[in-house]
């Protein structure tokens, strides 16, 4: 009898736990589409756009002169930007999006917490255009000219968005929407959005580019100091994504580099990856276009091996990387940083307060490198032939 009573009590306890969990799940989010049905209070939709104030159809800003900075949105009070759309003329092949800078300032700060060339921020590398689709960012038709962001960007004491024209040319037409929610107060625990562009031309090892041990011994990476840094900030927050733009001057695979994360002042990384393509949720040295809401390859090199430009992205929507006091995210440029790569990134994260970003690369520093072409390869072959004694029947793989 005592045993049956115990079983009954246990069964009732389990039923109670399951009922509590079920009730809790109903109160909490069941998914994004479920959230859409919930009624909201205390919010007003607001928009700033380039609409023609006369009611005409010239729905773009007056031309930006070379070197001009202009505030396109200066929002007072409390709220959250939840959508940005921009398109620009002339097109990217005539007016590089790599030299138009977008900055965002939160809560009356004099320093930006978002600073990036506008193309790389939205998902357009170099001076190119192509369609790109992810959950928080996209660049849509026609042929990669409609740039959109759906990142939530909260502010308590105002927000300001600034554009700077560093192209050396005139921006003839700049169209935009900035949609935001006006609120009396922000929900609890809302962080501030940050985005930082960085760039490097990495240096090969003194013994050369020894990837896959083809030209020399492949040594371990015992000193992470040479890793490329894509986020380096102090404070509490969480990392939510990266756009990664790599231009390789060699047909060799560029992606043996591992990601390494130093969280809250760690001397050694607590998170270490197994390869660049693995970090971006792919495998085996891919070079095929692919799009997923959280990761993808919108632009691949289409050349011999991995020579040329590749754009990869990953957003940590379900798996943010959290930090309490600091984070430094790095990645090798090839195994043990053995490769020369023209590499740039835009990192996206939230912090409990808007902070100042590291210094931004200059126009000259971020200037895209030219493509390696067939004539360059023939010069390589000529130097190789001479190094091999210039035998008249040298083929190329001796």
Positions of PLM-derived features:
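Bacterial N-terminal signal peptides
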Residues: 10-20
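Beta-strand-centric surfaces of beta-sandwich/beta-rich domains
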Residues: 26-398
């Amino acid at each position: 009898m005592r045993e049956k009573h115990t079983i009954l009590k246990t069964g009732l306890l389990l039923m109670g736990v399951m009922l509590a969990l079920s009730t809790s799940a109903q109160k909490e989010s069941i998914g994004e589409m479920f959230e859409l049905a919930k009624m909201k209070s205390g919010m007003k939709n607001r928009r700033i756009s380039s609409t023609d104030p006369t009611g005409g159809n010239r729905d773009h800003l007056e031309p930006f002169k070379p070197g001009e900075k202009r505030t396109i949105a200066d929002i007072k009070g409390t709220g959250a930007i939840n959508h940005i759309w921009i398109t620009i003329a002339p097109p990217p092949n005539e007016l590089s999006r790599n030299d138009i800078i977008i900055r965002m300032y939160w809560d009356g700060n004099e320093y930006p917490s978002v600073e990036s060339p506008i193309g790389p921020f939205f998902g357009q590398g170099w001076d190119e255009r192509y369609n790109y689709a992810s959950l928080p960012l996209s660049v849509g038709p026609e042929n990669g000219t409609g740039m959109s962001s759906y990142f939530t960007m909260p502010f308590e004491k105002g927000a300001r968005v600034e554009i700077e024209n560093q192209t050396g040319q005139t921006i003839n037409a700049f169209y935009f929407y900035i949609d935001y929610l006006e609120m009396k107060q922000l929900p609890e625990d809302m962080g501030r959005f940050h985005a930082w562009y960085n760039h490097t031309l990495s240096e090969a090892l003194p013994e050369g580019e020894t990837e896959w041990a083809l030209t020399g011994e492949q040594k371990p990476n015992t000193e992470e100091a040479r890793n490329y840094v894509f986020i380096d900030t102090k404070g509490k927050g969480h990392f939510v994504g990266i756009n990664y733009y790599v231009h390789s001057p060699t047909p060799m695979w560029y992606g043996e580099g591992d990601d390494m994360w130093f969280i809250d002042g760690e001397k050694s990384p607590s998170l270490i990856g197994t390869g660049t393509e693995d970090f971006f949720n792919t495998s085996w040295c891919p070079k095929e276009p692919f799009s997923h809401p959280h990761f993808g390859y919108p632009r691949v090199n289409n050349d011999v091996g991995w020579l040329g430009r590749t754009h990869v992205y990953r957003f940590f929507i379900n798996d943010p990387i959290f930090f309490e006091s600091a984070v430094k995210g790095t990645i090798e440029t090839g195994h043990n940083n053995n490769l020369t790569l023209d590499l740039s990134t835009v990192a996206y994260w939230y912090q409990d307060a808007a902070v100042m970003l590291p210094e931004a690369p200059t126009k000259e520093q971020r200037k895209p490198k030219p493509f390696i072409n067939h004539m360059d390869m023939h010069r390589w072959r000529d130097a190789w032939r001479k190094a091999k004694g210039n035998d008249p029947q040298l083929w190329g793989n001796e």
